[in-house]
């Protein structure tokens, strides 16, 4: 790989120190590297960490400096671009962002030498409707959660798969998870761990009000 782009979470790397170190090392190795300019207020943007339209078309890899949350959000921002992402951990969790300061140069060397395995990860698209009107639409690399809030005590869910009724849940919420998300919220709610490269969807109830309720595993095209 020869052309790189760096996205940095300003809360995790406030001075851009890690991003600058990455750029300096890649330049030392004779490679191109662009650091994304710091963005304006999130409330004024349609994206959170990066504007996918500003990333050069010839970019071969995007390095995301932050924690797992930063990487998950960057994947959502980059949904329309087919560019590999690599997380550089500066957060409290580093399950997805595997690179840290101790092995950063080694990881960059492997990228430069094309000595890497690129994993394809599935994503979810979720839409919320009210009275047949679409309220919102978004994407997720890990999971989509529908949960109670405020004084709402319990939610009755009717689950349909491809238009066919599957079952009902009475629970505090439900987690629709990808394989990537199977080790997150879904796992803490009693869901199974599956290979991150699998092609399937997990449905896991949150605090179900029956004792024999378990997660459901569905095909990816459900």
Question: What are the language-model segments listed below?
Answer:
Residues 1-54, 93-175, 183-222:
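Catalytic phosphate-donor-binding core of small-molecule kinases
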Residues 55-63:
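Short acidic/histidine-rich motifs immediately flanking catalytic phosphotransfer sites
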Residues 62, 85, 174-175:
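Short, well-ordered beta-strand core segments
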Residues 64-68, 75-77:
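N-terminal glycine-rich "phosphate-gripper" loop used for MgATP/nucleotide binding
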Residues 70-72, 183:
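Short glycine-rich, flexible loops that bind phosphorylated cofactors or substrates
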Residues 73, 78-90, 95:
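Gly/Ser-rich helix-loop-strand patches that form or flank binding pockets
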